[in-house]
């Protein structure tokens, strides 16, 4: 645990001491946890046009570099780190999916420059990177500064609650990935 000590003199010259602690844990760090009561049934869409997605999405900074998915100009964006490869997740609210059915998936993505950025889209039964093991869009490297649509399908083997995760996984010292207009069609 890393402690930060803060001291300040009051007007009466008395000393006050404040203590705050931050934890440096070696596991995934969740900034926002999914808060809706019931899983959503597709069709489902999210534009990321404003900050409201932060209320229902789970954001995980797996490499703990303090760079994470954030609202940016009508999108969700993840930026680079000059020392660590990107390893950051943007995970949907819980979705109620039927086994044996196919759901269409699409998302618009662009990069912040001409650097190759890498992403993948996965789904699974929990909102953790370890559970998001089923590919919707395989790991893909892109470099374009206009939004382009990427598509895939979600085909769960069994019925239940599932999550979809957009994984920013670019090499270190690139620039940024921005996403908008995520859509999951009805079965």
Where does each model-flagged region fall?
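Extracellular glycan-recognition surfaces and repeat-rich motifs
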Residues: 37-83
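Extracellular beta-strand-rich recognition modules
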Residues: 48, 92, 101-111, 119-121, ...
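Extracellular beta-rich ligand/substrate-recognition surface
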Residues: 77-88, 140-144
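Extracellular carbohydrate recognition
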Residues: 85-89, 169-186
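Extracellular carbohydrate recognition and processing domains
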Residues: 128-158
